[in-house]
Amino acid sequence: MTLKLYDTMTRAKRDFVPSDPERVTMYVCGPTVYNYAHIGNFRPVVVFDLLFRVLRALYGEDHVLYAANVTDVDDKINRKAAEEGVPIGVVAERYLAAYNADARALGALAPTFQPKVTETMDAIVGMIGRLVDNGAAYAAEGHVLFSTEAFPDYGKLSGRPLEDLIAGARVDVAPYKKDPRDFVLWKPSKPGEPEWESPWGPGRPGWHIECSAMIEEALGLPIDIHGGGIDLVFPHHENELAQGVCAAHPHGHGQTYARYWLHNGFLNMAEEKMSKSVGNVALAHDLLKTWPGEALRWALLSGQYRQPLEWTDTLIEQAKSALDRLYRVLDDAARPGDAAAEPFVDPRVEAALHDDLNTPAAMAALFQISDELRSAIMRKDAAAVAEGRGRLVGSANLMGFLAQAPQAWFQSGADEDLKARVEDLLAQRQAARAAKDWPRADQIRAELAALNVEVMDGPSGATWRIKEQA
């Protein structure tokens, strides 16, 4: 089954054909680590994690290389460090650790590589040097700038005509720029800011060159897939493309920088893009204190990835209910002593995901599989139940769902005090049943029901779960 992906460059859905099926490469722009990331920052994380999983299923886990960078040199990091009176590295490492913890809680696999700007400085300086040597960059007043005239296809990725590109440049154009569209590759550091040595004087890199250098060092150029949010198409990815090609080839002609460009839509709140500058944000760090990460992942994938998605409490509640439904049928299908079913992916789920990651269709297929499994349970068809369990688990696992035991899922809504109370009541109930004190056993079951706890008795003992909300 052919994987089809929508390519921003061609404005069309294309069959995915990697340069080398034995070495499939993908790069996605990662975080600037100056604060806790909001849930909108994690939409690309979850979307491209899904693509990473699909690629690994297609080509093999050892044949897919995924790099997601970390920007740990930035004015916002500098300001945060100055406010706290600590080195910038302390701020960057703190929020990188929090970001990675949130990503894992959302079910995102760790990327193969997570390069940092501070650890790629030699490669950055080297790439700028090649651009200067190729006549695609020039030094001016301590800065080094990319000359957009060196790349004839500048504007092709974003589809913007020349006049729009010029109008989109800063109103106050620096006097040392030859063209308003030219952008900074290297700049002098201000007093108190971190700086690195370079042939053009001490300073630090511009934003765009960082990604190109990290891609080249981690994966090599060209890569198969370059991903990120739709807001990065221009200027960031447009500039990456221009400098990446020109660093490798004089006159801006030659190999492709990335074979496919993929971009996810905004996550909106109150019909505006979620943004710290606007103030309409929900931190993933805070949401994870209230909601299971798997439910947040479902919510993030509930819409087609290229379209905007409105983030609301209702969206999360619906995601939690959807997973409750799947976990419940999986729990009901489990019988002590049943043979473990080998997980496998249902063709309906595979077809949906291979159609440009059509997650709404894939989720609908999961519900169809769930209903079929429920029917097999009602018929008491052991073979069909075992097969259905394997089908549901394998299909959901490909999407990063049903990653835990049903009992763990249903108990995740209980705090430690409630868990201790339930376990104590179950122990009392077991003792009452052993003593044939049936009135007491029934009384305890009623107490558990009042706690919104459902008890399931089986040959291996009693298990419990939080009741599904009506």
Swiss-Prot record:
Organism domain of life: Bacteria
Assembly with partners or alone: Monomer.
Main subcellular localisation: cytoplasm
Binding-site residues for Zn(2+), renumbered to this chain: 29, 211, 236, 240
Keywords: Aminoacyl-tRNA synthetase, ATP-binding, Cytoplasm, Ligase, Metal-binding, Nucleotide-binding, Protein biosynthesis, Zinc
InterPro entries from the UniProt entry: Cys-tRNA-ligase, Cys-tRNA-synt_Ia_DALR, Cys-tRNA/MSH_ligase, CysS_C, Rossmann-like_a/b/a_fold, tRNA-synt_1_cat_dom, tRNAsynth_Ia_anticodon-bd
GO cellular component: cytosol
Named cofactor requirement(s): Zn(2+)
Residue numbers binding ATP: 276
Short motif ('HIGH' region): ranges: 31-41
Pfam families with a match to the protein in the record: CysS_C, DALR_2, tRNA-synt_1e
Organism: Phenylobacterium zucineum (strain HLK1)
Annotated protein name in UniProt: Cysteine--tRNA ligase
Class of this enzyme: ligase
Record-stated family: Belongs to the class-I aminoacyl-tRNA synthetase family.
GO molecular function terms attached to this record: ATP binding; cysteine-tRNA ligase activity; zinc ion binding
Sections of the chain in a coiled coil: none
